Amino acid sequence: MIWLTLVFASLLSVAGQLCQKQATCFVAINKRRKHIVLWLGLALACLGLAMMLWLLVLQNVPVGIAYPMLSLNFVWVTLAAVKLWHEPVSPRHWCGVAFIIGGIVILGSTV
C-alpha cells in the first residue's frame, strides 16, 4: 500500500509541475490573470497534497530507497510534455529516461 502512496505522491508532484507549465502558456491578455490564478492554484493544491503523501511515505520507507523513486517524476514529465505540448525529446533524453527506469527497477528489487 505504501508503494502505491509513493507513486501517487509522484504523480501529484508531476501534476503540480505540469500545472505550473500550463500557467506559463500564452492566453489572451483579458484572460491572462484568470488563467494564471487557476493553474497556479491547481499547482499549489497538487504539490501540497503530494507533500502530505510524501511525509506518509517517509514514515514507512527508508529515505535512501524512497527518494530515488521520485526520479520517476522525470519520466512522467517527459511523457506528459510530449503528449500535452508536443515538445520534442531527443534520443539522448530518451536514453536518460531508460536509465532512470532501469535504476528504479534495480532499487525496487532490493526492497
UniProtKB/Swiss-Prot annotation:
Residues 40-109 form the EamA domain. GO terms for molecular function: carbohydrate derivative transmembrane transporter activity. Pfam families: EamA (PF00892). The chain crosses the membrane at residues 36-56, 61-81, 88-108. Pathway: Bacterial outer membrane biogenesis; lipopolysaccharide biosynthesis. GO terms for cellular component: plasma membrane. It comes from the Bacteria. It is a multi-pass membrane protein. It is found in: Cell inner membrane. GO terms for biological process: lipid A biosynthetic process; lipopolysaccharide biosynthetic process. The keyword Cytoplasm does not apply. Keywords: Cell inner membrane, Cell membrane, Lipid A biosynthesis, Lipid biosynthesis, Lipid metabolism, Lipopolysaccharide biosynthesis, Membrane, Transmembrane, Transmembrane helix, Transport. Belongs to the ArnE family. Translocates 4-amino-4-deoxy-L-arabinose-phosphoundecaprenol (alpha-L-Ara4N-phosphoundecaprenol) from the cytoplasmic to the periplasmic side of the inner membrane. Heterodimer of ArnE and ArnF. PANTHER family: 4-AMINO-4-DEOXY-L-ARABINOSE-PHOSPHOUNDECAPRENOL FLIPPASE SUBUNIT ARNE-RELATED (PTHR30561:SF23), SMR FAMILY PROTON-DEPENDENT DRUG EFFLUX TRANSPORTER SUGE (PTHR30561). This is Probable 4-amino-4-deoxy-L-arabinose-phosphoundecaprenol flippase subunit ArnE. It comes from Shigella flexneri.
